[in-house]
């Protein structure tokens, strides 16, 4: 692939790690953010120490506070901003774009107010003549590992397979590999909903339960994620892939996962507001729990783990009682789809 110009919107941990992947591939990378000290640090010290204390970025990776400068003459735009501000940033992009670009996003969540997937928001806000079909970049990927060039395999999903193949070529190299998929609904719901299950797995750890319990919540969590996704129109096979079970494993078992760490802290009895303040990063699984619970209620989808986490976070239920309460649910077949 010839050298491409790519704007990455959001210099958080994942946006920064992906900027290094693209830079390693010889592309022109521009990070955009709205925190002056962070942007100055990236440009002058070539570090982003809030997320990576010991990593020095290539000097060719530049950052800017000026969205127009970031978008000028780019071939592709990657959104890696928190779910709750995706629509706002997309509106700002739409007001500036003056040429057609490949639009990608690598965030994992559902918009709280509308319950919409992020690709749907981008499609609604950015005019079709200024963008490709949206490409979702998702899968099992800790930024802390990608930034040190550890082997990572993820998915590029789009309704337009050619757009997905473009993104596959854009990112893939000797340590970072993408597989294509056309099931956007499946990939996005898997990426968003697995954060809820990671909170649950972390809570079990914080409560002192062992591997048997964690394996159970991850496996049964995958079942309820799949049930909801299929109800929304996803292909069930997607949940067996990188963006499904792969992402669930990496997020539901690792201390790198902020959702797992948040769940562990909840299990230890810490208050949510203290957890969020101490972590200093967005915990997408908290907001997604509420959205998923509401969707499941509307559609009549059985999601006991999501319900238990929801009641603990939003109704003040004791998290241990909520989780143990699932052990007395009515007996079911492992393969029930409702």
Curated annotation (Swiss-Prot):
The keyword Acetylation does not apply. The active site is at residue 194. Sn-glycerol 3-phosphate binds at residues 108, 139, 141, 194, 247, 257-259. This is Glycerol-3-phosphate dehydrogenase [NAD(P)+]. Its EC number is 1.1.1.94. Disulfide bonds: none annotated. It comes from Streptococcus pyogenes serotype M6 (strain ATCC BAA-946 / MGAS10394). It is found in: Cytoplasm. Pathway: Membrane lipid metabolism; glycerophospholipid metabolism. It comes from the Bacteria. The gene is gpsA. Keywords: Cytoplasm, Lipid biosynthesis, Lipid metabolism, NAD, NADP, Nucleotide-binding, Oxidoreductase, Phospholipid biosynthesis, Phospholipid metabolism.
């Amino acid at each position: 692939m010839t050298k491409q110009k790519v704007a990455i919107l959001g210099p958080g941990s994942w946006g920064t790690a992906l900027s290094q992947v693209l830079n390693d591939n010889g592309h022109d990378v521009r990070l955009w953010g709205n925190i002056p000290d962070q942007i100055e640090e990236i440009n002058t010290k070539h570090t982003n120490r809030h997320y990576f204390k010991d990593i020095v970025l290539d000097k060719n990776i530049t950052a800017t506070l000026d969205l127009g400068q970031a978008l000028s003459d780019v071939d592709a735009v990657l959104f890696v901003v928190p779910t709750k501000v995706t629509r706002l940033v997309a509106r700002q992009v739409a007001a500036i774009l003056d040429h057609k670009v490949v639009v990608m996003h690598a965030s994992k969540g559902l918009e709280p107010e509308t319950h919409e997937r992020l690709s749907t928001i981008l499609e609604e806000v950015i005019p079709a003549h200024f963008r490709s079909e949206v490409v979702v970049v998702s899968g099992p990927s800790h930024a802390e590992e990608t930034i040190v060039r550890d082997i990572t395999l993820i998915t590029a999903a789009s309704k337009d397979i050619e757009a997905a193949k473009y993104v596959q070529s854009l990112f893939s190299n000797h340590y970072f590999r993408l597989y294509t998929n056309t099931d956007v609904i499946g990939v996005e719901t898997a990426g968003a909903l697995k954060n809820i299950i990671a909170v649950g797995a972390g809570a079990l750890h914080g409560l002192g339960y062992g591997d048997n319990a964690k394996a159970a919540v991850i496996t049964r969590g995958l079942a309820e994620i799949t049930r909801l996704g299929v109800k929304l129109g996803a292909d069930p096979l997607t949940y067996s892939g990188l963006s499904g079970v792969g992402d669930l494993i990496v997020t539901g078992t690792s201390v790198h996962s902020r959702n797992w760490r948040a769940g562990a802290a909840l299990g230890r009895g810490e208050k949510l507001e203290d957890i969020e303040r101490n972590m200093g990063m967005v915990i997408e699984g908290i907001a997604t729990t509420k959205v998923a619970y509401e969707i499941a209620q509307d559609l009549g989808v059985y999601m006991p783990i999501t319900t238990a986490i929801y009641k603990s976070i939003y109704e003040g239920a004791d998290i241990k009682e909520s989780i143990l309460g699932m052990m007395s649910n009515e007996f079911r077949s492992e393969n029930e789809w409702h």
